[in-house]
Every structure is written in structure tokens, then in C-alpha cells.
């Protein structure tokens, strides 16, 4: 497993997360990583074949683990990152250094985030989404004291550009997307980070965490 500080730095510096079924990841994820994915959220749908899923995960760790953070949606699989989706009550971590993320449903989860979580996924299909507005205002993306969060949805490059213009700096693609689209999205976000007035200070902070 990766050491704690490295995991923390990697989630702070992540721009693009992609969500896809774990069983499809062996075929699809290598291309998505080349396209710019920093985090892969691998879903099991709650009906895990633990032996099969563990083998897939270990193979992915072996070949891609230094290039992408691998997140799972279940405590049954040991990974460096775990995401709690709505309705999940079990907050156990896959191992003591693992990062825990939360897919939020209410503004209060953004305004006063639970200290158990190291990052958030904020659903919102448009820049005017109340949850996204709350996230930009209460957790400015490139600030040291903010909880890192991803705008989550089935975005294309055009919608990501619109989100960036309202202050979004990380996206979570719930439908995976094509490699070509991912490359465009990654470039939009890279440019937004470079042009953000908080970027230099945030970068210095993040790499030391």
C-alpha cells in the first residue's frame, strides 16, 4: 500500500476521477489513465464476487497503481481509497492509511463536512446546481483549508468548461467517457488550475502533505 502522505498529496492534486464497474476496469481503465484520469472509482454494485474482484483489483494495482488512485465502493476489498455512496453506513477503511470519500446529498455535508472524510463527490449537472454553488462558496477548490471535492455527473468537455468558469476545479465522470473526451477534459482542467490565482500556493502545500 502507498504511504499516508503520498495518498493525501495525490487526492489533493487530482483533477479527474472516472467511475466504472470494477469488472470492466481491466479493459477500459488503461486507456482512461492515458487520457488523464487521476482517480478510478471502481464499483461493485454491492454484489461482489470477492475472489474475482480482488484479482482484478490486484492486477490493476500492479500495472496502474502508481499512475492512478484506485477507489472501491465496499469495505470488503482492500484498496487505498474507499467511497461511501448514499445509504452506506459502514465507514470502515480498507486499511489504516486508506482515504475515505463521501458522495454528498445535502448542503450541510458540504458546509460542515464530516471530518471522517478526506474528499467529497458533489452531484450537479449544471453550474447553477445548489450543491455545486455551496461547494464553490464554502470549500474553494484550491485552498489549503478546503476539503477537496469533485463535481460529479455525466459531463462532456463543453459542460466541464462551463463548470470551470464557475469555480469548479475537479470533476468525477460518472459515465466514464471516451479517451478522446477525457483528454479534452483533462486539458480544460489543467489550464484552469494554472490560471487559478491560488494555484502556486496550493501546489506547494499539496506536494508536502
Task: Walk through the language-model features, giving the residues of each.
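Short, well-ordered coil/turn segments that N-cap beta-strands
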Residues: 11-16, 36-39, 64-68, 79-80, ...
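Catalytic cores of alpha/beta
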Residues: 27-29, 70-82, 105-117, 137-151, ...
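N-terminal amphipathic alpha-helix/helix-capping segment at the start of soluble metabolic enzymes
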Residues: 1-27, 200-209
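Glycine-rich phosphate-binding active-site loops on the catalytic face of alpha/beta enzymes
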Residues: 42-44, 83-93, 119-128, 160-191
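Surface-exposed amphipathic alpha-helices with a cationic face
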Residues: 5-9, 54-65, 89-99, 132-145, ...
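Active-site mouth loops of central-metabolism enzymes
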Residues: 10-27, 99-106, 149-155
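N-terminal active-site wall of soluble small-molecule enzyme domains
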Residues: 37-95
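Histidine/lysine/aspartate-rich catalytic loop segments that bind and position anionic ligands
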Residues: 96-134
Amino acid at each position: 500500500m502507498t504511504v499516508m502522505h503520498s495518498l493525501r498529496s495525490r487526492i489533493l492534486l487530482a483533477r479527474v476521477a472516472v467511475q466504472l464497474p470494477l469488472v470492466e476496469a481491466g479493459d477500459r481503465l488503461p486507456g482512461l489513465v492515458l487520457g488523464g484520469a487521476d482517480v478510478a472509482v471502481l464499483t461493485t454494485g454491492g454484489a461482489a464476487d470477492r475472489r474475482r474482484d480482488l484479482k482484478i483489483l490486484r492486477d490493476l494495482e500492479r500495472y496502474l497503481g502508481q499512475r492512478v488512485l484506485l477507489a472501491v465502493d465496499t469495505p470488503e476489498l482492500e484498496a487505498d481509497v474507499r467511497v461511501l455512496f448514499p445509504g452506506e453506513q459502514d465507514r470502515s477503511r480498507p486499511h489504516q492509511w486508506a482515504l475515505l470519500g463521501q458522495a454528498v446529498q445535502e448542503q450541510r455535508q458540504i458546509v460542515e463536512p464530516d471530518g471522517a472524510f478526506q474528499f467529497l463527490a458533489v452531484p450537479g449537472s449544471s453550474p447553477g446546481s445548489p450543491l455545486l454553488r455551496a461547494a464553490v462558496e464554502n470549500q474553494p477548490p484550491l485552498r489549503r483549508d478546503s476539503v477537496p471535492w469533485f463535481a460529479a455527473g455525466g459531463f462532456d468537455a463543453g459542460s466541464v468548461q462551463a463548470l470551470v468558469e464557475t469555480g469548479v476545479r475537479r470533476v468525477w465522470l460518472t459515465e466514464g467517457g471516451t479517451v478522446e473526451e477525457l483528454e479534452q477534459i483533462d486539458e480544460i482542467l489543467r489550464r484552469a488550475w494554472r490560471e487559478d490565482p491560488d494555484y502556486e500556493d496550493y501546489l506547494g502545500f499539496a506536494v508536502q502533505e
